[in-house]
Amino acid sequence: LLSQALGMTTADILKHLAQLSRHQLPPDASERVDSAIEARLARELTAIAGVHDAVSSLDLPKAVVSNSRRCRVLASLATTQLEEALGDVPIFTAEQVDNPKPDPAIYRLAAHELGCPPSRCLVVEDSVAGVTAAHAAGMRVIGFVGASHIDDEQPDRLLAAGAWRILPHMRGLRALVDEWQLHLQGQDNNETAQ
């Protein structure tokens, strides 16, 4: 059940649970669950090993794209001190689109706001919903499987959803970005030659 919920909005998770149960959830269930999650994240969330160095090493335009609420994303970036590594990057959340991931709308919005064609965007995602969304938007996707909440079957699920490569540890991000950039250069050279 956790692997199915990964990357979904709280409201969508609760809808799914309601379909599996005979119990009626209270009207404020989503808000109560979000508040409990955010309180726990504030106490327990830590940065993924190597993520600060990996992000800091990339001299490329960046954005944060999440199905979480904006307040949760901002708090998580502050708690993990990733806001320092990322700098002043745009943040896109499910609140900004009618249909959250796995719909590609949020990734299309991010590409548009960055002024970058989706085909020239590289995404790092840990959820099937996120990989599905980014892939459907026409982006190249790295499936990250180095977080503590990831199970052993997640790499296969991410590849099936459209991930281009699997990243087990953030120390490998720079090499995958370099490989992707070489691929883009090859495409550019082919287009110029034609």
Task: Show which residues each predicted segment covers.
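Hydrophobic alpha-helical core bundles mediating ligand binding, dimerization, or RNAP-core interactions
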Residues: L6, T10, L14, S30-E38, ...
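Metal-dependent phosphoesterase signature
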Residues: K15-D53
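Asp-based, Mg2+/Mn2+-dependent phosphohydrolase catalytic module
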Residues: H52-S56, L60, R69-Q194
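Active-site neighborhood of HAD-like aspartate-dependent phosphohydrolases
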Residues: L1-S3
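Helix-loop "lid/cap" segments that line or gate small-molecule binding pockets
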Residues: T9-Q24, S76, A111, A147
